[in-house]
Curated annotation (Swiss-Prot):
Its main location: cytoplasm. Pfam families: Pan_kinase. InterPro entries: ATPase_NBD, Type_III_PanK. Belongs to the type III pantothenate kinase family. This is Type III pantothenate kinase. Gene3D superfamilies: 3.30.420.40. It comes from Bordetella bronchiseptica (strain ATCC BAA-588 / NCTC 13252 / RB50) (Alcaligenes bronchisepticus). Keywords: ATP-binding, Coenzyme A biosynthesis, Cytoplasm, Kinase, Nucleotide-binding, Potassium, Transferase. It is found in: Cytoplasm.
Length: 267
């Protein structure tokens, strides 16, 4: 059994992959903890049906957090290997000028999405809504040409509340023409997030001559889903397309499992 670790800025998401089980079994459902609650990680390890042999993970929460997670795993008899983005792995070719500068979580997420695809597939747009929102494209040739990073919905809301004198930590409904401050902030955040998806969908369509399939993930997606789907529908209609995002619960863990299963480069 191999433990899979996605250490994000806010949450620690964990699962497992068992290459020795029939059909290379996965966890029934991934589990998420606050990234500061390593006691919860230790308790989860104690519930596993088999003692893990090792762990594979990606960590964007800093060196100290990675060391603390590694210590918790070691206490359970399991060493972890933290992965970094590679120039080429599982067919995904990394187009970053410096390939290892690409966030390991973004890379593993794209690997996970690509692992779901047949050999011939359309362009793919992978949007993850966490502390930061990232939007990454994979071409039909399996090349990642680049992507966007912007503040996630919660960070946008917090920045307005803490960086200004009078704006609240907003909790309002999204509207075309907001009529109070809470609505105005909520609508602005949803518009920014949805607009980024539409921008990259249009860019992919122009670059590849066909509409990208959209995959979404992350805890911030429910907040922006309605506005994103509305703008995508309006935009797609102009091209005779109906873009419908597919939600994935744990594409980073899926990518780690694929890398573990196929022995792909992970140094």
């Amino acid at each position: 059994m191999i433990i899979l670790i996605d250490s994000g800025n806010s949450r620690l998401k964990v699962g497992w992959f068992d290459p020795d089980a029939p059909q290379a079994a996965r966890e029934p459902a991934p589990v998420a903890f606050d990234n500061l609650d390593l006691d919860a990680l230790g308790r989860w390890l104690a519930t596993l049906p088999r003692r893990p042999q090792r762990a594979l993970g990606v960590n964007v929460a800093g060196l100290a957090r990675g060391q603390a997670i590694a210590a918790t795993l070691r206490a359970g008899g399991c060493d972890i290997r933290w992965l970094r983005a590679q120039p080429l792995a599982m067919g995904l070719r990394n187009g970053y000028r410096n390939p290892d500068q690409l966030g390991a979580d973004r890379w593993a997420c794209m690997v996970g999405v690509l692992a779901r695809q047949p050999s011939v597939h359309p362009p793919l747009l992978v949007a993850s809504f966490g502390t930061a929102t990232t939007l990454d494209t994979i071409g039909p040739d399996n090349v990642f040409p680049g992507g966007l990073i912007l503040p996630g919905p919660a960070m946008m809301r917090g920045a307005l509340a803490h960086g200004t004198a009078h704006l609240p930590l907003a909790d309002g409904l999204v509207a075309d023409y907001p009529i109070d401050t809470h609505q105005a902030i909520a609508s602005g955040i949803a518009a920014a997030q949805a607009g980024a998806i539409v921008r990259q969908w249009l860019a992919g369509r122009q670059r590849y001559g066909q509409a990208p399939e959209i995959y979404v993930a992350g805890g911030g997606w429910p907040e922006v889903r309605q506005e994103a789907e509305r703008l995508l529908a309006v935009t797609g209609a102009a091209f005779g397309a109906t873009p419908r995002p597919t939600y994935l619960d744990s594409p980073v863990l899926d990518g780690l499992a694929a890398l573990a299963a196929h022995g792909a480069p992970t140094a």
